[in-house]
């Protein structure tokens, strides 16, 4: 995996996260779970700027979103689902170890000890 490929994933991921965040912000049903997903999207968007392995953050992000969607019965329309599929493709580049290193349901995995985690 070359630097140019990593940079391409970073750019695509940031654009996709931005678009998904905007669509979720427009939804009328702003539940606590949906607000948590938006918080995590914003946090990963920020982390991608400096991360050496953006695909790992995207993998964690998509696993968190899928887990929250199942747990809280969140339905994503086609446009939002298509954006998550793009993120899923980038996240697959993290390899198998990326899936076993995090609790998918825990929002705190996206925040360092010095960062304040929003609670809803």
Where are these regions (language model features)?
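Short, charged early-sequence alpha-helical segments and their helix-coil boundaries
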Residues: 49-85, 103
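Short, flexible helical or helix-coil boundary motifs
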Residues: 20, 24, 48, 65-72, ...
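Charged, low-complexity interaction regions
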Residues: 23-35, 52-55, 73-76, 95-99
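Short terminal alpha-helical segments
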Residues: 1-44, 107-120
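Amphipathic alpha-helical binding modules
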Residues: 73-120
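Generic structural concept
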Residues: 14, 38, 42-45, 62-66, ...
């Amino acid at each position: 995996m070359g630097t140019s490929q990593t940079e391409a994933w970073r750019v695509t991921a940031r654009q996709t996260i931005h678009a998904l965040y905007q669509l979720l912000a427009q939804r009328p049903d702003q539940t606590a779970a949906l607000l948590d997903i938006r918080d995590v999207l914003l946090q990963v968007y920020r982390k991608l700027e400096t991360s050496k392995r953006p695909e790992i953050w995207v993998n964690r992000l998509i696993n968190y979103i899928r887990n929250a969607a199942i747990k809280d019965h969140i339905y994503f329309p086609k446009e939002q689902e298509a954006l998550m599929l793009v993120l899923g493709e980038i996240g697959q580049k993290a390899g198998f170890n990326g899936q076993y290193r995090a609790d998918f349901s825990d929002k705190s995995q996206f925040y360092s000890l010095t960062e304040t985690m929003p609670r809803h």
